[in-house]
Amino acid sequence: MVNQELLNPKTITIIGASNDTGKPGGNMLKNILAGGFSGIIYAVNPKEKKVQGITSFAEVKDIPQTDLAIIAIPAKYCPETIKNLAEEKNTKAFIIISAGFGEAGEQGKQWEQEIITSINSVNGCLIGPNCIGAITESYKGVFTAPVPQFNPKGCDLISGSGATAVFIMEAGMALGVSFANVFSVGNAAQTGVEDILEYMDENFNAEKDPLVKLLYLETISNPQKLLKHASSLIKKGAKIAAIKAGSTAEGSRAATSHTGAIASSDMTVRALFNKAGIVYCSSREELLSVASIFNYRKLEGKNIAIITHAGGSAVMLADELSKGGLKVPEISGLDAEKLKTFLYPGSSVANPIDFLATGTAEQLGIIIDYCEHKFDNIDAMAVVFGSPGLFDVENVYNVLSVKLEICNKPIFPVLPSVVNAQREIQSFLKKGHINFPDEVVLGKALSQVFKTPEPISEEISLPKIDVKKIRSVIDMVTEGYLDAEQTEKLLDAARIPRVTELVENSKEKLLTAIDSLKFPVVMKVVGPLHKSDAKGVVLNITSKEEVSETFDRLMQIDSATAVMVQPQLAGLELFVGVMKEPGFNHTILCGLGGIFIEVLNDVSAGLSPISKNEAQQMVQSLRGYKLIQGARGQKGVDENQFVEIIQRLSALVEAAPEITEMDINPLIGTQKNIVAVDARVRVG
């Protein structure tokens, strides 16, 4: 859908252009003129013969042919205007900044559809409606401010919200972040974030194109396209960070009223981002911090040296790095002692390296050199240096600027004195560097970048399962929850181990069969979906008499059809499950069972199909992972078996895409084996 008429037009016509730069059509023209567009510009305004020095036409029928039309007129006039442009003026690219379309109601949706039909009939491209426009190397087609200078090595920004794009650019420019192509897709009636990413991927040149891509999404209309092209770009050398808004019911409602978006589960989105290699961000501040990190050398290890003259900042940064899985290793030995001789008395080199409020530019340079060349246990440096009010810090920032250029290890500058050292910071930014004004924000962003996995590059191989048997079960069901027998057949076909059990609706038969099990046992009602809520689970049954009494009680529960008896197993409770969001592949979940999932929500997710590496990452990212390994004298579980079960569950839903929900909770795990104790499956 993206075409050269959009990216590099020879002629641009602004319909609704104005001499009043307080109006969108007026400021749009002003920005294009000021941006140095080298082609021909036409204006359409029935009341003016000249608009900002440009010849103005009264009607669209009067203009010459035009590559790109930018529309800034009321929504009700857009369908006919665009039809004329497409059919009579050979226009192939359209930007509609007007609002009042799909986000406003049924009439707006109808206008939107008429517009799409006209544009598609000429294989054209539409950005919008309800957007701020676009910036390319050719033109500055936005009606807002600020308008960043195009930097071919800056960040590409693709946003589902025009205002958010403005806020990101405004805040980014203050930090030293530069921008290249900017696309505000608005309602994305024809061209969405995924489509622009597709074009960037298919035409990517790692030597010439911007490497950093920033996304703000309110809807993911084509998850598979996003996954395919984001992961492809990252494999080619690009770096992508994204915000996905509308992940709660409240956020979804706000997104719906804004652009007609439908929110998807935050957990599913995170799983998609992880599979693609996209860094997940939850705010503009975090997005820009990640973008800033992308603009520095890649962090190859987790060991960070904190270099500062501010002890409190160092403590906060060390805490944040540690919480995020990075390390601030102790620095010691002969080289550390030698470094100390260059610093003032009272300085510390243990890490954080604190060279006091009186520390000099020369001392900073020496410290960085030692971290670069002498301290092999250091992978990167964070330099926190503000203005203590004792001296001009420009020399300090000059040294930092030089070291940023020549050091192989990444250096992340935190220059917090945005008032005291405003002039010096601006001088630093003009040299092409980026500032992190807050050390905690840097710590969070560094951790987020470091723990984001590389995109899945392997051909995913899933365990062998009995697909024929799975289909024989699924094909007999239309929708709803499977019964116990059907669920057991699916588990067996997927070769997911399950506990031995008896299911009977006759007490006499159950009492006869119970001899095959060892006490203690667990008895569960069959029929009600939520057994615990129905008080249909009884533990620690140690005799036939208790079996008889419990059977009678359980069969009195509403909708009870039978009673299930299982051995009462000892071990660590685990959980695996499946959920399916519209448009997405199945999301596979894993975690610890019991309180860990119910109260602490300690769950990790991956998008099916799940590779072995992905399954391992899912397990190891759990907050309760130490319990899986074994902690405080408690024996752990067989991690390899847990990983295999996650993969087998993925194989099951790949064979049975009709499954919409599934959970196995709990699995009971020991060092020797892991078995499913309870499961439920929903299709439809």
Functional labels for PLM-detected ranges:
Residues M1-G684:
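Catalytic-core regions of core metabolic enzymes
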